[in-house]
């Protein structure tokens, strides 16, 4: 059975750590509304950090040489989770394949039961930015 989690209003790092633990336990997880996941912190600092990562590609041949960092919100979340699991080992790669991330709510998932993640709820966050906003600033089209 697939666990569906709505990412709207949840904190990126807390949600990613919870999801990575569940993936390593063998669950299949689908995240919806990835563009509404929030990143806590100063907006200028958040944008500068992600912009630096995207611009870090090789000068000589940026299409072929890495590191390649994503711009889309669903891919940014997948990359965050990937950093929390041993994706180069067999069990980590198998766990990573059980993660599906969607922008918005796909038609086949409408009306299905959504699991609440209490650990990822924001607590006393005054400065934050949504993943969708970061992606648009980085030039993503989704």
UniProtKB/Swiss-Prot annotation:
Entry GO CC: cytosolic large ribosomal subunit
InterPro entries on file: Ribosomal_uL13, Ribosomal_uL13_bac-type, Ribosomal_uL13_euk/arc, Ribosomal_uL13_sf
Q: Which UniProt keywords apply?
A: Ribonucleoprotein, Ribosomal protein
Q: Extract one GO molecular function annotation from the record.
A: mRNA binding
- SUPFAM superfamilies of this UniProt entry? Ribosomal protein L13 (SSF52161)
Q: Which GO biological process annotations does it have?
A: negative regulation of translation; translation
List each coiled-coil range: none
Q: Which Pfam families match?
A: Ribosomal_L13
Q: Does the keyword Ribonucleoprotein apply?
A: yes
Q: What does this protein do?
A: This protein is one of the early assembly proteins of the 50S ribosomal subunit, although it is not seen to bind rRNA by itself. It is important during the early stages of 50S assembly.
Assembly, in brief, is: Part of the 50S ribosomal subunit.
Family of this protein? Belongs to the universal ribosomal protein uL13 family.
Q: What is this protein called?
A: Large ribosomal subunit protein uL13
Give the taxonomic lineage as stored in the record.
Archaea, Methanobacteriati, Methanobacteriota, Methanomada group, Methanobacteria
């Amino acid at each position: 059975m697939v666990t569906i989690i709505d990412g709207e209003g949840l904190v990126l790092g807390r949600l990613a750590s919870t999801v990575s633990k569940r993936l390593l336990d063998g669950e299949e997880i689908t995240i919806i509304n990835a563009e509404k996941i929030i990143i806590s912190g100063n907006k200028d600092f958040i944008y500068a950090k992600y912009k630096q990562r995207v611009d870090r590609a090789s000068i000589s041949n940026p299409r072929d040489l890495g590191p390649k960092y994503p711009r889309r919100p669903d891919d940014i979340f997948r990359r965050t989770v990937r950093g929390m699991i041993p994706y180069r080992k067999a069990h980590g790669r198998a766990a990573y394949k059980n993660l599906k991330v969607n922008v918005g709510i796909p038609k086949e998932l409408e009306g299905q039961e959504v699991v609440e993640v209490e650990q990822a709820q924001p607590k006393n966050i005054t400065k934050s930015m949504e993943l969708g906003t970061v992606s648009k600033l980085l030039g993503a089209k989704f």
